Each structure stands twice: as structure tokens, then as C-alpha cells.
């Protein structure tokens, strides 16, 4: 049964990693980023819901006094 020749595996793997690195660097360098990014202002209409007109208080179990 013949032995598997693995002598070329190292150079194949190294060249593949190098090629992928170069390709990704070129892809990233060609990407155009906005020069001055700014936050978008969103105008939301204020809707009055039934529970907003009433006073409610929610008690968290951790904020209750110790017994």
C-alpha cells in the first residue's frame, strides 16, 4: 500500500492562507466608507396609550424590602 505524500501540503496551505489574506485586504481597501458618519434623526409620532395616562408602578422583586 503506497504512502500518502504530504511533502507539498505545507506550501499549499501557506500559499492558500496568503492568497486569502491578500484577497480580503484588497476587498476591504476597495470598500468606500462614509467620510463623516452622522446619527440619523428619526421623528416618531407620540402616541398616547391607555396605560400612559394612568399612574402605575411596577415593583421589582429585588427592590422590595427584606422580610
UniProtKB/Swiss-Prot annotation:
Report the transmembrane regions from the record.
8-24
Keyword field = Acetylation, ATP synthesis, CF(0), Hydrogen ion transport, Ion transport, Membrane, Mitochondrion, Transmembrane, Transmembrane helix, Transport
Q: Does the keyword DNA-binding apply?
A: no
GO cellular component terms, alphabetically, are: mitochondrial membrane; proton-transporting ATP synthase complex
A GO MF annotation of the entry reads:
proton transmembrane transporter activity
Instruction: Write out the function statement from the record.
Output: Subunit 8, of the mitochondrial membrane ATP synthase complex (F(1)F(0) ATP synthase or Complex V) that produces ATP from ADP in the presence of a proton gradient across the membrane which is generated by electron transport complexes of the respiratory chain. ATP synthase complex consist of a soluble F(1) head domain - the catalytic core - and a membrane F(1) domain - the membrane proton channel. These two domains are linked by a central stalk rotating inside the F(1) region and a stationary peripheral stalk.
Family to which the UniProt record says this protein belongs: Belongs to the ATPase protein 8 family.
Protein name in UniProt: ATP synthase F(0) complex subunit 8
Please name the source species.
Equus asinus
